[in-house]
Amino acid sequence: MEQAVRSESKKGQVTGTDLINEVSKAKKCTVIGGSGFLGQHMVEQLLSRGYAVNVFDVRQGFDNPRVQFFIGDLCNQQDLYPALKGVSTVFHCASPPSNSNNKELFYRVNSTGTKTVIETCKEAGVQKLILTSSASVVFEGVDIKNGTEDLPYAMKPIDYYTETKILQERAVLDANDPKKNFLTAAIRPHGIFGPRDPQLVPVLIDAARKGKMKFMIGNGKNLVDFTFVENVVHGHILAAEHLSRDAGLGGKAFHITNDEPIPFWTFLSRILTGLNYEAPKYHIPYRVAYYLAFLLSLLVMVLSPLIQIQTTFTPFRVALAGTFHYYSCEKAKKLIGYRPLVTMDDAVERTVQSFHHLRKDK
């Protein structure tokens, strides 16, 4: 395999330096999906902690002379191998956006692509693979309060994202093999937000500008975990560093959140009011909203042979907005020493300040 791709190593490399060759292997890593929201924050923290970093992605999302970029398809082992050769740790955080409805893309990236990542890691001699999973792998649209990692995988996943995240996490954890010096772990964040977030805040403000944020689903008391992006990154790095000291941690999943559950609508309202938009005032009973969303989904399905309709008002989104779903971080605290670096108050303030360009003029 190495000979087959040695001549390809320059093809996918876009920019960067040879720093990756000047650092001890223990501090060399590759971030798959490093051009994305979470990936960019991960690269920044890794660099600040003295790591040499490769980024593998379908595009180069930023410029940094301290980073080596490799562009390619993660389903293609020849594209992937040069980015993984010579590193000790791979952070795999590539995934289509969770709000997509492209089943084929989810299966290709999260399932097929992850299998390729696992095989290529083994070929390249990578010692640790840390996956960005999701707490949604145990969520079926009903209340979860202080859920632990012992909860079973969802039997009825709420969407293609969750469905393929379950397959992805299982594949990575099952690949753990201490005898062959290949250790894996999965980090399960929930509701990632922060500066440069391309989804939560921009989508929320777009809805507010269109007058779609006047109503809240349910009584507004349902607690949910939202997690600041820097805390998510911190959890990944802790997992990798503790795996180096304790191989017994391999094959495990860890919930990583801000450890401060907050009412779903309170969180959204803080973002909205921080950017000078009105918070939702009116309540729609949860069951009414869910029933209406269910009827709409049936209508969309019936009409699908004639016309393609994209709707954001789905039973899944109603469940996300109207149920309790927050998770225990005790396992991560005990086994990898996790503590959030940034509190919810500071995280919301920093996020709001970073989106000043979306602020509504008073």
Curated annotation (Swiss-Prot):
Membrane-topology descriptor: Single-pass membrane protein
Keyword terms: Acetylation, Cholesterol biosynthesis, Cholesterol metabolism, Endoplasmic reticulum, Lipid biosynthesis, Lipid droplet, Lipid metabolism, Membrane, NAD, Oxidoreductase, Steroid biosynthesis, Steroid metabolism, Sterol biosynthesis, Sterol metabolism, Transmembrane, Transmembrane helix
Motif (Prevents secretion from ER): 359-362
Pathway: Steroid biosynthesis; zymosterol biosynthesis; zymosterol from lanosterol: step 4/6
Gene Ontology CC terms, in alphabetical order: endoplasmic reticulum; endoplasmic reticulum membrane; lipid droplet
Catalytic activity: a 3beta-hydroxysteroid-4alpha-carboxylate + NADP(+) = a 3-oxosteroid + CO2 + NADPH; a 3beta-hydroxysteroid-4alpha-carboxylate + NAD(+) = a 3-oxosteroid + CO2 + NADH; 4alpha-carboxyzymosterol + NADP(+) = zymosterone + CO2 + NADPH; 4alpha-carboxy-4beta-methyl-5alpha-cholest-8-en-3beta-ol + NADP(+) = 4alpha-methyl-5alpha-cholest-8-en-3-one + CO2 + NADPH
One protein family per Pfam: 3Beta_HSD
Annotated protein name in UniProt: Sterol-4-alpha-carboxylate 3-dehydrogenase, decarboxylating
